[in-house]
A protein has these predicted regions:
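N-terminal pre-Walker A segment at the start of P-loop NTPase domains
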Residues: 68-92, 96
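Walker A (P-loop) ATP-phosphate-binding motif of ABC ATPase nucleotide-binding domains
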Residues: 100
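Short glycine-rich substrate-engagement loop in P-loop NTPases that contacts/grips substrate
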Residues: 79-86, 129-157
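Conserved catalytic network of the ASCE P-loop NTPase/AAA+ motor domain
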Residues: 93-96, 122-124, 155-157
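Interdomain "pre-motor" coupling segment immediately N-terminal to P-loop NTPase/helicase cores
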Residues: 5, 9, 13-66
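Walker A/P-loop
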Residues: 103-127
């Protein structure tokens, strides 16, 4: 069995390997399932693991300032957050339509938290995100303009 685990690891099927270990550790739970059903569970676990690893890689690359999630948004304070709008934004339609979001508000109103939460959500949907403060983005564009590489910088992200 160790040889099989080594092969699965070499093939980078670690989710499949771990799910197989789980199935073998709990034979009563999976014993009544047929071969195709068990194989389907193993491949589904591998796909889930890959999606999770991709999302974590995208989140790490985005360099978010905060580890924020939409589920942690505080609607109690008078911040003017519309639950229906946030729910709509969380579905990611604005991403598929290639629309932008501009967050404005007073200092401490939660703009950074909301931006990071929407970015995390987009990463979990498989989108590449990069978190920029406006000042840093403008400085990079200005430097790119001086070096005539602004377009390349923006296309990269």
């Amino acid at each position: 069995m160790n040889h099989l685990y080594e092969q699965l690891t070499a093939l980078k099927l670690t989710g499949f390997r771990d799910a197989l270990k789980k199935q073998l550790a709990q034979p009563g739970t999976y014993q009544e399932l047929g071969f195709e059903e068990r194989l389907s569970l193993l491949t589904a676990e591998e796909l889930t693991c890959r999606e999770n690893r991709k999302a974590e890689r995208l989140i790490k690359h985005a360099r978010f300032r905060l580890n924020a999630e939409l589920s942690k948004l505080d609607y109690r304070n008078n911040r003017g957050l519309d639950r229906a709008l946030i729910r709509s934004l969380s579905q990611g339609n604005w991403l598929t339509l290639k629309q932008n979001i501009l967050l404005t508000g007073a200092t401490g109103s939660g703009k950074t938290f909301l931006a990071c939460a929407l970015g995390h959500n987009a990463c979990r949907q498989g989108y590449k995100v990069y978190y920029y403060r406006l000042k840093a983005l403008m400085e990079q564009c200005y430097q790119g303009k001086r070096q005539r590489s602004t377009v390349l910088t923006l296309i990269y992200w």
